[in-house]
């Protein structure tokens, strides 16, 4: 039944299909997926135990509406958002485009979300920490489009939300908010990192703060970000967001490209950052993961964890169980005793 429903959704406008999927998940209309976790896939990172390295990327559950259903589908962790202080509609529609032949999506959503207050209420009402003590929930935050001072928005969001999640992500890399990626320039990036760390200390918090990076940065920007990350002892980087390079799908649409065409580009950046930081900064690898071999490749280049999104939308609710079981088998076949042994093998 669920496979039929998924095939039906793939014939709809992508944003309509997404909205229907969210409503179905809220109503409990999804398969209850069970499988036995294996210690071979477990890791402890930032003092938190991840049952597997597989999480859901930000962008799917923007308003923290389906935390429980997503975790019930087999994800070890989910990342909510991106949330902004005030609700905003985002960019004009249509703003999501499928390219099945390329296993890709292009989106120009523009941080559409219901705002911080509804987001906060949804997390609080979910009681996920009581119901899912063995799962991890991250919160991805960003600035409103009209904001002149990005730090004021980030400070407000951090103050309100840092107690509600297991880690915080600062989104500096969406191509759909004008000027956002300028904050990856060394001076701006260092200022944001420093201020968020000060704010965390002021709140007597130890929550990990990660930064989501663009795949389109220059070699010099990589070096600058790596140096700043090491100097400030940041908790982690998410590599990478979507790309403005859409040459692989031969499209001139506005927005960011995700899916299979991003795989090799994100892999290179993962390997580069792992090398530049001597493996001292934790990396969540994102971009073009469709099977267990893809996960293993990203981890061998230096990722400790991975996130999927596009392949989940293409392959449906059983995809995560399939990835997890395949990964467990692959790890054993290659002679590893633990998933953590894989990290950085090819860097």
Placement of each model-derived feature along the sequence:
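A gly/proline- and charged-residue-enriched helix-loop-helix capping module
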Residues: 81, 86-133
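Conserved, mostly hydrophobic/aromatic
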Residues: 13, 56, 78, 119, ...
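C-terminal helical cap(s) of enzyme catalytic domains, especially alpha/beta-barrels
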Residues: 87-103, 246-259, 312-337
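Catalytic cores of alpha/beta
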Residues: 63-70, 155, 217-231, 275, ...
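Active-site-adjacent beta->alpha loops and helix N-cap segments on the catalytic face
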Residues: 86-95, 116-117, 176-205, 216-220, ...
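Short beta-strand/loop segments at the ligand-binding rim of alpha/beta enzyme cores
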Residues: 49-55, 132-141, 200-217, 273-285
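Glycine/Thr-rich beta-alpha phosphate-binding loop at enzyme active sites
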Residues: 22-35, 175-188, 222-279
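Glycine-rich phosphate-binding active-site loops on the catalytic face of alpha/beta enzymes
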Residues: 76-88, 172-174, 236-244, 295-322
């Amino acid at each position: 039944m669920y496979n039929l429903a998924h095939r039906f959704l793939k014939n709809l406008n992508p944003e309509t299909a997404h909205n229907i999927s969210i409503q179905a998940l809220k109503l409990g209309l999804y398969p209850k997926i069970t499988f036995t976790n294996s210690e071979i896939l477990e890791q402890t990172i930032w003092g938190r135990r991840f049952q597997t390295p597989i999480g859901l990327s930000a962008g799917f559950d923007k308003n923290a509406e389906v935390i429980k259903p997503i975790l019930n589908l087999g994800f070890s962790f989910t990342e909510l958002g991106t949330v902004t202080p005030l609700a905003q509609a985002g960019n004009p529609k249509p703003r999501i485009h499928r390219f099945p032949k390329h296993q890709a999506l292009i989106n120009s959503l523009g941080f559409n979300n219901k705002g911080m207050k509804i987001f906060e209420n949804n997390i609080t009402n979910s009681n996920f920490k009581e119901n899912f003590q063995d799962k991890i929930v991250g919160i991805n935050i960003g600035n409103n489009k009209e904001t002149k001072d990005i730090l004021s928005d980030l400070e407000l969001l951090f103050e309100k939300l840092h107690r509600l999640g297991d880690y915080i992500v600062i989104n500096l890399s969406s191509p759909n908010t004008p000027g956002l990626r300028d904050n990856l320039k060394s001076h701006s990036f260092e200022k944001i990192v420093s201020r968020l760390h000060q704010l965390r200390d002021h709140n007597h918090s130890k929550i990990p703060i990660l930064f989501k990076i663009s795949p389109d940065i220059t070699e010099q920007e990589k070096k600058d970000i790596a140096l700043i990350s090491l100097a400030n002892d940041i908790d982690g980087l998410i590599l990478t967001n979507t790309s403005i390079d859409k040459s692989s799908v031969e499209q001139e649409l506005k927005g960011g490209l995700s899916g299979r065409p991003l795989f090799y580009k994100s892999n290179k950046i993962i390997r580069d950052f792992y090398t530049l930081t001597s493996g001292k900064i934790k990396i969540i690898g994102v971009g073009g993961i469709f099977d267990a071999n893809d996960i293993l490749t990203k981890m061998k280049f230096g990722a400790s964890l991975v996130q999927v999104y596009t392949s989940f939308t293409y392959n449906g609710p059983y995809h995560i169980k399939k990835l997890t079981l395949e990964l467990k088998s692959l790890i054993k076949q290659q002679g590893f005793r633990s998933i953590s042994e894989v990290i950085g093998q090819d860097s």
